[in-house]
């Protein structure tokens, strides 16, 4: 193809990893701690499964973000019921409360998310509908496309239910 192949040298120590290529050196500090066991989380062990129109959900979340100032960390509150998903956000600018028709299996759930992360996940899926898998208000949710070739994990945020 005429493109030259570049060599990347990777080395690491107990605390750092180093990538060297061309005239560039990238050093990153390794982080210690407990991490989610993704393999266990990706099992079909969920409490709530939601099928929803991707475009409706994305448009609703986009509208909600108009009420949040840049840098303000207001979560979007999602209340999942039998046939409806209610999305709420409240800020100094105003408030929004919208409902979207869904197909739900499992339990009702009240959960909060950073709207930016939901938007990032939904924008890359081409399907008309998406499936959202949830365990509880403290556990990550998974958004999957129809072929399950794309899985997006989003951590929930704490919120004041009265907000």
Task: Tell me what each language-model feature is.
Residues 41-45:
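Short hinge/gating elements
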Residues 1-31, 46-163:
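DNA polymerase processivity clamps
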């Amino acid at each position: 193809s005429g493109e030259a192949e570049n060599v990347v040298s990777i080395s690491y120590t107990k605390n750092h990893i180093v990538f060297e290529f061309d005239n560039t050196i990238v050093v990153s500090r390794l982080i210690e701690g407990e991490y989610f066991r993704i393999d266990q989380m990706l099992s079909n062990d969920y409490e709530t499964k939601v099928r929803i129109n991707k475009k409706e959900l994305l448009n609703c979340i986009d509208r909600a973000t108009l009420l949040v100032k840049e840098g303000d960390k207001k979560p979007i509150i999602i209340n999942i019921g039998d046939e409806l998903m209610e999305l709420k956000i409240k800020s100094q600018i105003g408030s929004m409360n919208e409902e979207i028709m869904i197909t739900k299996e499992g339990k009702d759930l009240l959960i909060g998310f950073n709207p930016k992360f939901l938007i990032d996940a939904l924008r890359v899926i081409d399907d008309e509908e998406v499936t959202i898998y949830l365990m509880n208000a403290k556990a990550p949710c998974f958004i999957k496309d129809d072929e399950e070739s794309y899985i997006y994990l989003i951590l929930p945020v704490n919120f004041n239910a009265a907000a």
